[in-house]
Amino acid sequence: MMMDILMYLFETYIHSDAELQVEQDELEDELLRAGFQQKDIYKALVWLEELAALQQSDEHSAISTCIASASTRIYTASEMQRLDLECRGFLLFLEQINVLTTETREMVIDRVMGLETNEFELEDLKWIILMVLFNVPGNENAYTLMEELLYTKEQGILH
């Protein structure tokens, strides 16, 4: 599954501060050896390229300047099908605590919709948010807070 590949790459190369300059062929070979399917590998690499392109494009900057900070996001039918009520509520929560801006929220939604999956849940959304925040310069504090939210939930809350 594409989401599994993205999480594998994020944990192996990005989150672990491993060497980021890996040749695509070398990366594909490693993913094949790890048991992933060629077509899923290709889709995941395209997804990552599109994330990088979003970060560099002016499209989202233009969108965010047009959206008032107090506005409410209206989701399309296809977005609501992919992002259930819990996911949409979590996105709103992250905006309210300033982890996501309107720009990064739109990037997250774009990348969620770029996934080719019928099964998507809150934990998947959290990983997508981490990937987006990691790839957008100037979001280090938001990334750290999101990382804490993700790992605190996974490890359980200590008393």
UniProtKB/Swiss-Prot annotation:
Give the matching Pfam families.
DUF494
- Highest taxon listed in the record's lineage: Bacteria
- What family is this? Belongs to the Smg family.
Q: Which PANTHER family match?
A: PROTEIN SMG
In Swiss-Prot or TrEMBL terms, this protein is called Protein Smg homolog
Q: Which organism is it from?
A: Vibrio campbellii (strain ATCC BAA-1116)
